[in-house]
Amino acid sequence: MLGLHVGTLMISLFLCILLEPVEGSLMQPCQPINQTVSLEKEGCPTCLVIQTPICSGHCFTKELVFKSPFSTVYQHVCTYRDVRYETICLPDCSPWVDPHVTYPVALSCDCSLCNMDTSDCTIESLQPDLCMTQRVLADGMW
């Protein structure tokens, strides 16, 4: 009976090793994709919804089975390699508020460590098109 269990375990392990590259290849690679994003600012009653390229996709990563308090785990994420910034003017802002908002436009992406200065590195962040105020579509959207 033990031989049957060990044999089944070995077959399962073999299939996991064999199919691992297939599973990774079925996932979208790290690349720029068009995403609906909301732009808003305190003092402006309107949330402007635009489409812009962001970085999204799968990055291959490994984690040690045996963890040591002396080892550091580095997780690679899909993040900006080359980026350009664009500025847009929000409508109906209060007179004392600068209506301009600057946002990143992904030109190319890379699997690398998350840079907290330019990226949201949280496990679960807000959706990129979430608005706290009234939504308005930017010209040319849909």
UniProtKB/Swiss-Prot annotation:
Its keywords, alphabetically, are: Disulfide bond, Glycoprotein, Hormone, Secreted, Signal
Q: Does the keyword Oxidoreductase apply?
A: no
Instruction: List the Gene Ontology MF annotations in alphabetical order.
Output: hormone activity
Q: What is its main location?
A: secreted
Q: Which GO terms describe its biological process?
A: G protein-coupled receptor signaling pathway
Signal sequence extent: 1-24
* Name this protein carries in UniProt: Gonadotropin subunit beta-2
Which species is this record about? Coregonus autumnalis
Its organism's taxonomic lineage begins at:
Eukaryota, Metazoa, Chordata, Craniata, Vertebrata
